[in-house]
């Protein structure tokens, strides 16, 4: 009887041991498959270090959403988890999100600035974290260093492409004196300032004397805003030869306003920037004369790769297919590309 009891006890011990082993194996699998808010395996990719990277977005729009998707795809490919947070154009939220990433133990953060003058505060909030600014260049480029870099496009270049297209258009008509309506983005923002300066200075260099048909319209990069603001000019009889817009959305607002006023938008050149899907369609149809492709995918994937390069101690342009600035090694440029009726099919 004692032997039977002993045998039963030994069997129970053995079963408990086997159950414990099975429980440990199950727990390891669960840990390996755990998901972050980015929806990717936290253990994928190379080992060591915090595998989470936060992208702090100034706001959501069509173009920036494409940038986010490209950054997330690049993160996933390299075995990192990306979490995107939207500041809703609130400077204070940007600081809070950066601090949260730092407190979570993240080692690098990607920031699309709400305000270019905010860069110093972002770097301070990041503490020991490395920072990649994307798309919006800090107002003070002297803040950039081996731990704080920029990936984006040279905004002045977009204006240069607009001006060259307009100069060619008007010279073909034998015209060197023109009046323009200017649709500005967010006032004070680097993209607004540099795109505007680029187009106006290059028109002068090209021998085109361009004067304002009205005061610039500050439309905040918004289609509906542009439509509302330009409509009174169209119905008041204001004379103009072209519409220069800091982005496609505002240019498309002007197109809609002209159609609403029974005017043909293809009768004069309307130029934009970004080459959004709608912008490309407008160029193809003739409603817009041209746009300038701003590579959202290149900026998003380039920023993520630069962030990973900083973590690994590699040059920031490694594996990006891009080049650093000739004078500032902490800037990686993503080139703009002019888009006209001749090549728009390549962008659709």
Give the positions of each predicted feature:
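Short, solvent-exposed amphipathic alpha-helices that sit
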Residues: 63-80, 158-165, 190-209, 225, ...
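Hinge/cleft segment of the Venus flytrap/periplasmic-binding protein
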Residues: 51, 183-191, 202, 302-348
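Flexible loop/hinge segments that line or gate small-molecule binding clefts
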Residues: 121-157, 276-284, 288-289
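Sec-dependent N-terminal signal peptides of Gram-positive bacterial secreted proteins and lipoproteins
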Residues: 2-24
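Bacterial lipoprotein signal-peptidase II cleavage site
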Residues: 19-46
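Hydrophobic alpha-helical
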Residues: 111-131, 199, 215-281
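Extracytoplasmic "Venus flytrap"
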Residues: 51-74, 83-96, 106, 112-116, ...
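Hydrophobic alpha-helical segments within soluble ligand-binding/sensing domains
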Residues: 49, 94, 150-178, 226-227, ...
């Amino acid at each position: 009887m004692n032997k039977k009891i002993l045998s039963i006890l030994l069997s129970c011990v053995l079963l408990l041991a086997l159950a414990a082993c099975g429980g440990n194996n199950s727990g390891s699998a669960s840990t390996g498959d755990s998901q972050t808010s980015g929806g990717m395996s936290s253990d994928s990719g190379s080992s060591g270090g915090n595998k989470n990277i936060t992208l702090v977005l100034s706001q959501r729009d069509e173009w920036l959403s494409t940038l986010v998707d490209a950054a997330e795809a690049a993160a996933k490919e390299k075995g990192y988890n990306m979490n995107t947070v939207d500041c809703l154009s609130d400077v204070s939220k940007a600081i809070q999100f950066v601090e949260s990433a730092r407190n979570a133990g993240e080692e690098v953060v990607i920031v699309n600035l709400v305000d270019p003058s905010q860069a110093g505060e972002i770097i301070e909030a990041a503490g020991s974290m490395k920072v990649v600014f994307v798309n919006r260049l800090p107002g003070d480029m002297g803040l950039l260093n081996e731990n704080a870099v920029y990936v984006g496009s040279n905004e002045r270049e977009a204006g240069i492409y607009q001006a060259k297209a307009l100069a060619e258009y008007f010279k073909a008509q034998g015209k060197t004196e023109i009046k323009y309506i200017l649709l500005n983005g967010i006032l004070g923002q680097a993209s607004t300032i540099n795109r505007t300066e680029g187009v106006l200075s290059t028109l002068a260099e090209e021998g085109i004397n361009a004067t304002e048909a009205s005061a610039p319209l500050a439309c905040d990069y918004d289609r509906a805003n542009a439509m509302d603001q330009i409509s009174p000019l169209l119905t008041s009889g204001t004379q103009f030869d072209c519409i220069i817009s800091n982005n496609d959305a505002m240019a498309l607002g002007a197109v809609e306003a002209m159609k609403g006023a029974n005017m043909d938008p293809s009768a004069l050149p309307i130029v934009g920037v970004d080459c959004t899907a709608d912008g490309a369609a407008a160029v193809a149809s003739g409603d817009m004369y041209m746009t300038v492709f701003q590579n959202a995918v290149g900026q998003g994937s380039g920023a993520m790769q630069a962030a990973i390069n900083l973590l690994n101690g590699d040059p920031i342009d490694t594996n990006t297919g891009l080049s650093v600035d000739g004078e500032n090694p902490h800037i990686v440029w993503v080139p703009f590309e002019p888009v006209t009726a001749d090549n728009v099919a390549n962008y659709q």
